[in-house]
Amino acid sequence: MPTSKLQANMSYREVIPRNLSPAEWIEVKINTGTQSTLQDLKTFETSGGYCYKNTKNVQTRNRFIYWRTYQDVLELSEVSLDISLQRNHLRLRFTDSAVLNVSLTEQGTSVTLLVVTVSSVHRYVFPLKVAGQEGGAASPEDLLSQSIFYDVNDKINDPSTYYVTDGFGTMPNAAVSYLTQDSQSAYFAVAYQSKLLLHVMKCSTGHTITHEIKEPKLMPWFLSNLKGALTGRSETLEAATSMAFSEIGGEIFILVLYRNNELRLWSVDNLQTVASINCSTELGQDSAAQGPQNSQLRKISDQNFCLFLSHNSRAEFICVSIMPDADDASVINLVQNMVPAPQTDLVDFDATSSHIWALWSNAEGDFHVSAAYFASNNAIKWVSAALEPPPDRYCLTMEQGVDPRETYCSYIFHPGRFDRNVIAKALYMFRRVNLQFDVKQLSMSVLKEQVCQAVEDEIQNELKDFVVTDEEYLEISTRLWDRFYSCCEQYHIKLSEPTGLAVLGGMDAVCLVRRQSFALLRPCEVLEHLLLIGEHNDEVATYVAPLFRNDPEMAKGFVELMNVVTLLDKLISEDIKIELDKQLYQRESPVEVISKLVARISMIDDNGPILPSNCVRQIQQKLQNIPNLEPALEMLLDVLCMIDPDEPPHDYSLSTRFLQSSGALMGSEYGLSILSETVKQMAMIRFSVCRNLLVLQYMAYGQNEMESENVLTNLNYLNSYYTLVWIAETPISSSTPAGFEASIQRLSRAQLFSGYNRPYSSHLKHNGNDQTTLLRLFLESKGLFSALTMLLKHDSLSLDSEQLNLRQSLLQLVGYINKMLWPGSPIYVFPEWLFGTCHHIIVQDYVRILSNWCSVQKHARRFMLAVSLLDCGEAHKAVHLFHEAESGIVEDDFLFEHVLKNTPLYGKLQNSVSRGDTISPEDTKLAIVHYYLKVIQLFEQHSALDYIIQLADMAIRVLQPDDPQLPMFQSIVFNNHLQLGHYVEAYTALVNNADISRRKDCLRQLVITLFQNKCLPLLMQFSYIGLQDEFESIVESRARSMSIDQNEVYNFLYAFHTNKGNMRKASTVMYEQAMRFQVDSDAPNALEKRCSSLLICLNCLHLVDSRYRWIAKPVLGDEQVITIDQDNDDGEPKCDEDKRGQEVVVLELADIRRELVHAEALRELSFYRKDTAAYERATPEELSYLLASSGLYTAALKLSRGHSFSVLPIFESLTSACVAATEDKSSDAWNWLQNNDMADLPHRSNAADMAWTLLQKLVVDNEAKDSTLIRKSVVQRLLGLNAFLPQWLINSYKLSHSRELLHLLVKHNRLLEAADLGCEIIAGMLGAGSEYFEFKHAVNIANPQLCFPISTIDLLLHGLKINGKDDLDYEMAYFKLEEEVQRYIETIKRTTDDKMSMAVLQMRTDLQEER
């Protein structure tokens, strides 16, 4: 059977472009200066269309213009299914002049518009923008996207473009226009009630000539052979109703159809009738007048025309041809096969050489389209086209507890359900106020807010005086929302009424023009024809037999089975279908759902059974009457199958090009909309077939046979087509979701989304359409070009040169798109794109719908779902899904491409697969490692640390203990435990790490982290088995690298070594800390901390074995310079060995103790002087003097105890301070007294007394035994200050060295005091008070001789004698001392004599004894 016959007898289906941008009209007003005629003429809304003929040109392929007129307005819209045109809507308003006729003609690079109004004729030329032929800076893409109306401006009112025909009295009732083939002249024929005028306009100048076409009184000779009579006509019957021009052999004719159904052919050249025939007479009609409908004439070609003739009892279509007879005269012949017209009202029709297309309406106002194929005797008479029904309010089901606003908004604002203008007009009606706004500037989201606010205002108006319950509120809300929906529905029905149709010949489609939009009638496929139309199915079986192995019986069985499926579809109510869809969406078992449905079909409830018993029996009987049911069922399943399971997989995901305005096939806004609507229509039809077929299978086989292969296949198809319907209907935002950029960046950084470009198209302007469907967005961004790639690859077509009609392009593209969307398809273009949209709710819903029945690409879907859940913050769910997807890393193409793409393993595995080799377990294991690494990178960007540990543990379980990748995952476990604060687990992980270097690195991180978080007790308790030296090194390095001012590491090290019992290391740490405080710190408490460190160091060393009580100290810079100076006068060490030897100094206890005393002295000084830092390098002696000068005498003396310098300056300073305190009665002395240690001193209320008491205590405490240096220094200082000596000092001195005190007094000219002391000394020597002096005995014959200070006494006497001349006190003192000296001399003499006598006696006694 030829394919043409199959195409000719298949029906068509309406496709409405939905969710389009609002039309932006170019408004042009044309004023010809004529009188208003609108009130005198009743005009009907007419429409038509024109399809570009040069369909091989990419620019004009799938491109057409449709128009509609109403009174004085002509609206033209240029549409391209391939190119998104700009400024493609033109509205011409012929001021007060109704439009009668519109025609469009194409001439190479321009389109001519001819318009006839009741008072004028117009000709406009619109150039077609061709790339390369236009000047200026416009790019080729911009030129291609410019509509022919793009440059419309005020020149359209140029007088040369129109001619005024007003002034002929009566109003015209018909008109026709024509542009000659050479484009030189434009002809306009205007018919009035009584005459016919012809206007001829020269295109070059616009000059117009008017002729009247008249019937002559006598008939010429060459008309004698015409059939029919030309007499007996009235004026009314002779009025023309329809006309058409024809150009044959360079001669132009006008074919005129009159009200009496007479057809005349007029010659334009001589304005004479060439031929005439009465169609009613030829067809055997009794009445010459036309019937209740207007007879119409349509031009097919210059030789062929189609007529619609209305009679009293019926109507019909006939075709006429202008054919020359043997005598070269023109005759009109009737075509033999006439087509009876249906008994309904004709709205409009169009005809081609093979089809008649008619738009009908009935008394109820319903419209339908039908077509007749009259080029073959085997044609089906009339085949109806399936028009899209209006939105069904019964699909709006209110669920319990759901807000009516949510339900109605989701339904009303579903993408494509209602046009934006419809909702806006409904809003005006609902508000009942004259408040309008620019719809073009109003997005759907804003319009939705306006609608919700309007309904809410109405609700509040009804409730403002009442208090209602929740149930009453919901009832009122539902009623008002239903009222608003009714407004939407009314406007939608009104604005969707068809006004005409036009055959788009080059596209194999029909344009159905509506009041506010248009639709295309596309060819149906077999299942659509059988389910929707159901006409002439027996003949269809004959025509489809070639598709079924040329077996007529099988084709007949297939059609009979589809008849039963169609019957069941009509019997099942829409409520049940909607309920079934909901149950499938909720992933209930289809078999259980169908079993419940079949049980309900036969069960009688309160409302009776769903289907009458006779219907059930009828269905069962029809099934039994199909002789070859099983083959027919298998054939139906083959037709439903969308993919070839034996076809090798192809990678179409590499089609990365996006839609450009320069145009891909079906790439414009209109093309994409028609394509997506067609996919949706076919998916819904096939889903209905699968659903009804499953019911029939259950009814035929019963519950026990539902596991057969055919049933399982149908179940798979049912779920698959439901998925396609879900994709086609699911709303999705046209713009990128929140967080899209962040999600894409995360995927890109993890190298999981680098195989293709961004998933959103940028060239299509949505103009406020916030939402579209998932399918539409997919086609816009990637789906169409992937489908075109498949079309070119499989069909070897050239889209740039070959002419493709809708049957070849649209249906094939739909087939390839279905293959991409098919859940069981190996092509992963759609899942990949959906994954990249980052619409997580939709991704999760998609995976859920396929979860429990589709095994193809299940690992990829788990991976997609896991990524989606991770982005949504549900990492705990994502972990398990990532683990489940692990096994598909080398099996699933999607995972293989996206996970392994940028790894070294990718090329190796790809070569193995291409050679057909089996992938080794080692490579599989390595692939899993790469998989987990990328997944871990993804989790790291989400900071999901807990789950990274789980993933790493999963990877570790896959690896062998000696695997080189194992330490990496162990390090990952450690790092994430560390970041989470699981320090014990982190330590365990680092100890178990198989790589020593990683173990040390991890230990360093652990130490640093624990120090930063102040977890020192935890750091102390770890055992560090095998890592202690490394640990100490790390801690020491950290201690030295940190500022000493905020450094707790030294204290930790001291505690650590102390805890381990290593006191020598503990002392070293403390000494190093003290050095750091000395060298690096400028903190106020640095000296305090240094002293504390040195003190701790001393304590630790005391606990060490005496053999190891030393510390090795590095020589500091200044110390090294001092050492060099000591080595050599020239400043150089003696040799390199000496220099190296001096780099380290060994310190013993005494050295450290001296350093401690020095530090404590500096600390004391720092309390009272701000310039202490300047004296840090001062010697101990210098420092002691500084302390003394600051009144810190006890501190200065403490410093001196560890050193050998003299303390005499300290006591001299203190002595001076005591004298000053005595002489100055102010309280300043208390300031320096409080800075000294007076804990053991009795309290005195007088500062001077406290000062002398302090001096006494310090002298006593610090004077060495048998030494008078300190007292001498104090006495000298007192004498030098001419101060009195305190009695305690004199008494102490007398007991130690009275003669020295006497000498000091004499030396400082304190003669009277010296005289008194001299008298006391002499008296003591003589035995009177000797216990107050250092004498151990008095002058006595039995005692040794005493040393008498004869020089001092002599000098004292001399001084007294000299001063006694002028002062009586000195004279008396002189005499008294002289007297005492004389007494002492006498006593000495006597004693000496006695000693001599005794010596003589003793000697004698000894001699006698010897004898």
Swiss-Prot record:
Signal peptide as annotated in the record: none
A GO CC term assigned to this protein in UniProt: nuclear pore
Phenotype upon changing residue 730 to I: In strain: s189
Localization in the cell: Nucleus, Nuclear pore complex
SS bond partners: none
Molecular function, one GO term: structural constituent of nuclear pore
Protein's GO biological process: double-strand break repair via homologous recombination; mRNA export from nucleus; protein import into nucleus; regulation of nucleocytoplasmic transport
Result when mutating residue 204 to A: In strain: s81, s95, s125, s131 and s196
Result for mutant: residue 165 to A: In strain: s95
Keyword terms, alphabetized: DNA damage, mRNA transport, Nuclear pore complex, Nucleus, Protein transport, Translocation, Transport
Pfam families (UniProt xref): Beta-prop_Nup120_160, NUP160_helical, TPR_NUP160_120_M, TPR_Nup160_C
Disruption phenotype: RNAi-mediated knockdown in nephrocytes alters their cell morphology and function. Reduces total number of nephrocytes starting from larval stage and results in shortened lifespan.
Keyword Cell inner membrane among UniProt keywords: no
Origin: domain of life: Eukaryota
Predominant location: nucleus
PANTHER family for this protein: NUCLEAR PORE COMPLEX PROTEIN NUP160
Function: Functions as a component of the nuclear pore complex (NPC). Involved in poly(A)+ RNA transport. Required for nuclear import of Mad. May play a role in double strand break DNA repair. Essential for nephrocyte development.
Assembly: Part of the nuclear pore complex. Interacts with Nup98.
Name of this chain's protein: Nuclear pore complex protein Nup160 homolog
Native source organism of the sequence: Drosophila melanogaster (Fruit fly)
